[in-house]
């Protein structure tokens, strides 16, 4: 899920910035088990993690960590407007990234895209193998200038071929769920759609 994506992003950047150059902050997250999981993953990567519950504490912690090259702030999916506001107060130039399961609903996507202060920089997808309905996220990638940056436990997606492969897999899965189409036709249709908007999904 999202906490695992945070770990993979931090781990992917540790070679560039070093473990001591990265910090992870869990902000205003009361999900059961989320903090212990983040602590465990951070410890396995040798990266410091912190837990903060309010805007004042977040601002103070970000200021204290100003020497770090990368600070990752993990927030829950509820109270998104308030959380983004707190992040903008603590770190006005922070880049905000979406993390969705591959079968996220259109309603959830709409709710997050409506948060104008976020200025979403990219999308990371989770639960690719368990996806039952990828069409909402496919439509989102086609209609919005938000690049796909991470997919599951993969390293960062850095070129169009990698993005197209992920989109092709999602489209193929969606087509198979809609109708019992022959495999060759499914693969062809998915590849065609992937080529159509893979360029819009990566910068």
Where are these regions (language model features)?
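Conserved glycine(s) of the Walker
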Residues: 1-2
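Hydrophobic positions on the alpha1 helix immediately C-terminal to the Walker A/P-loop
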Residues: 5, 9, 37
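Walker A/P-loop NTP-binding motif
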Residues: 10-15
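Conserved beta-strand/loop subsegment of P-loop NTPase cores
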Residues: 21-23, 93-100, 116-159
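Switch II (G3) loop of P-loop NTPases
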Residues: 22-33, 40-86, 90
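Amphipathic alpha-helical transducer elements in NTP-driven molecular machines
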Residues: 32-35, 52-59, 81-84, 106-110, ...
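Conserved Switch II/interswitch segment of TRAFAC-class P-loop GTPases
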Residues: 76-80, 92-110, 130-131
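NTP-binding/hydrolysis catalytic cores, primarily Walker-type P-loop NTPases
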Residues: 141-203
């Amino acid at each position: 899920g999202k906490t695992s994506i945070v770990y993979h992003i931090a781990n992917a950047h540790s070679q560039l910035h070093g473990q001591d150059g990265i910090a992870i902050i869990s902000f205003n997250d009361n999900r059961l088990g989320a903090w212990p999981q983040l602590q465990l993953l951070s410890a396995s990567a040798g990266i410091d993690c912190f837990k903060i519950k309010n805007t004042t504490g977040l601002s103070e912690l970000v200021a204290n960590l100003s020497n770090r090259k990368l600070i990752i702030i993990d927030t829950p999916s509820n109270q998104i407007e308030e959380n983004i506001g707190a992040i903008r107060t603590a770190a006005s130039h922070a880049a905000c990234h979406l993390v969705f399961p591959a079968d996220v609903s259109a309603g959830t996507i709409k709710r997050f895209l409506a948060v104008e202060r976020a200025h979403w920089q990219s999308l990371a997808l989770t639960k690719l193998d368990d996806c039952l309905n990828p069409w909402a996220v496919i439509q989102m990638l086609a209609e919005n200038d938000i690049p796909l940056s991470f997919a599951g436990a993969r390293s960062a997606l850095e070129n169009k071929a990698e993005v197209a492969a992920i989109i092709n897999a999602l489209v193929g899965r969606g087509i198979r769920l809609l109708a019992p189409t022959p495999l060759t036709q499914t693969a062809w249709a998915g590849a065609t759609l992937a080529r159509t908007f893979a360029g819009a999904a990566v910068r």
